[in-house]
């Protein structure tokens, strides 16, 4: 009968829907297993980092796992282990790769920052349960100086894009909520210098948005502030923003007058 046929069709749809749900659950489980396997490999005494990175890179792009904080936490952990192994070789006076030390530090920082961003998203009850922040903050703070070393190394190799990546990440850490207690914007005396080098690397590539992003962190510094203002003015002129360009020239002139008058004022006291 017609009713019987409709019921039969509905039952088939229900079965099909159940199969799809089971398949989806299976794919999710498989990807989560991949993440755990990647972490397990990285934790071994002699880790196969190529295998661990291959597995985690799949998870970082897979729709089932790419939005999970845990995926990015494991990605950061793998880079941390790569860094530790290189430093272990250095300590034992075995051959080690300096650039690998710097790049693993950079990648670790980026992955942990992304992990924190995802972990700060409220759950279905509107609560934030970020179990990663404390350990990952400590790891980033410990490795942050290597971002300067890596940036300088690439800058000296005239690889401005890579240098900017290092210097830019160093600056972005300073303003990230993860590091509220460290208060880097106020306590980090190297920040203006690194912002200057970030702006310089960006200016060499004519990457004016990056110049305007990083140069302001250096503009009030006594040593490099005037150069930072020149970078800002050049970038604004290149972008055709005449009003802001003229304003930046005036500001740059005022800063240079302040810096010129300060030694004179000290001599007159």
Predicted regions and their residues:
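Short coil/linker segments at helix-helix boundaries
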Residues: 78-195
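Start-of-domain marker
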Residues: 31-87
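Single conserved hydrophobic/aromatic residue that forms the stacking wall/gate
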Residues: 1-11, 258-269
């Amino acid at each position: 009968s017609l009713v019987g046929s409709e019921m039969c069709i509905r039952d088939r749809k229900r079965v099909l829907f159940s199969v799809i749900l089971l398949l989806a659950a299976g794919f999710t489980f498989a990807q989560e297993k991949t993440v755990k396997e990647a972490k397990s490999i990285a934790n071994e005494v002699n880790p196969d980092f190529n295998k661990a990175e291959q597995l985690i890179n799949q998870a970082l792009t897979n729709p089932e796992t790419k939005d999970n904080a845990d995926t990015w936490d494991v990605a950061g952990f793998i880079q941390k282990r790569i860094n530790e192994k290189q430093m272990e070789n250095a300590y034992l006076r075995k051959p080690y790769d300096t650039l690998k030390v710097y790049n693993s530090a950079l990648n670790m920082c980026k992955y942990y920052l992304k992990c924190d961003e995802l972990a700060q998203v409220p759950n279905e009850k509107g609560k934030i349960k970020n179990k990663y922040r404390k350990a990952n903050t400590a790891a980033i703070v410990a490795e942050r100086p290597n971002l300067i070393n890596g940036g300088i190394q690439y800058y000296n190799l005239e690889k401005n894009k890579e240098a900017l990546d290092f210097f830019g990440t160093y600056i972005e850490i300073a303003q990230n909520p993860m590091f509220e207690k460290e208060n880097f914007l106020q306590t980090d005396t190297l920040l203006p210098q690194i912002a200057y080098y970030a702006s310089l690397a960006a200016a060499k590539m004519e990457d004016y948005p990056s110049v305007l992003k990083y140069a302001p962190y250096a503009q009030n510094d006594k040593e490099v502030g005037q150069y930072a203002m020149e970078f800002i003015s050049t970038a604004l002129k290149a972008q055709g923003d005449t009003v802001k360009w003229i304003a930046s020239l005036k500001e740059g002139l005022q800063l240079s007058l302040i810096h010129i008058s300060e030694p004179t004022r000290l001599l007159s006291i």
